Amino acid sequence: MVSAFNTGRTDDVDEYIHPDYLNPATLEHGIHTGPKAFAQLVGWVRATFSEEARLEEVRIEERGPWVKAYLVLYGRHVGRLVGMPPTDRRFSGEQVHLMRIVDGKIRDHRDWPDFQGTLRQLGDPWPDDEGWRP
């Protein structure tokens, strides 16, 4: 999973993403379920935070079917982020990801990024009048 975000390579997502994959946080971006949804998420991250965006693994924990990943996202704000125009600023933000592995693949995925710290590094931008609604 981390490799996909770091390289942008998603042609192999069927190997590690379950057909019923869901990350509820992506629904507001029009990204739904399954391996193609994960590939869309990778594309969105790279379009919003640049091709230079990368995740660094801090710690990975496993308990039964659950995996908890402590990560840091590094990037540069180059695309629209919930209605906020690009600032071109660099940032790093800690994240926690919780995933359930089913049939050897990631099926359930939640993530909690540090929105407050990230926005502060981006200069605390506001959405423009267009907002984030389609």
Curated annotation (Swiss-Prot):
Gene3D superfamilies linked: 3.10.450.50
EC numbers on record: 5.5.1.26
Keyword Endoplasmic reticulum: no
GO MF assignments: isomerase activity
Involved pathway(s): Antibiotic biosynthesis
UniProt: nogalaviketone binding residues: Q95
Residues the record marks as active site: D111
Keyword Isomerase attributed: yes
Catalytic activity, reaction form: nogalaviketone = methyl nogalonate
Gene Ontology biological process terms from the UniProt entry: antibiotic biosynthetic process; polyketide metabolic process
SUPFAM superfamilies, sorted: NTF2-like (SSF54427)
Keywords: Antibiotic biosynthesis, Isomerase
Classification via Pfam families: SnoaL
Top-rank EC class of the record's enzyme: isomerase
NCBIfam families assigned: SnoaL_meth_ester (NF033407)
Family label: Belongs to the polyketide cyclase DnrD family.
Subunit-structure text: Homotetramer. Dimer of dimers.
Role description: Involved in the biosynthesis of the aromatic polyketide antibiotic nogalamycin. Catalyzes the formation of nogalaviketone from nogalonic acid methyl ester (NAME), the last ring-closure step in the biosynthesis of nogalamycin.
Protein name: Nogalonic acid methyl ester cyclase
Organism: Streptomyces nogalater
The encoding gene: snoaL
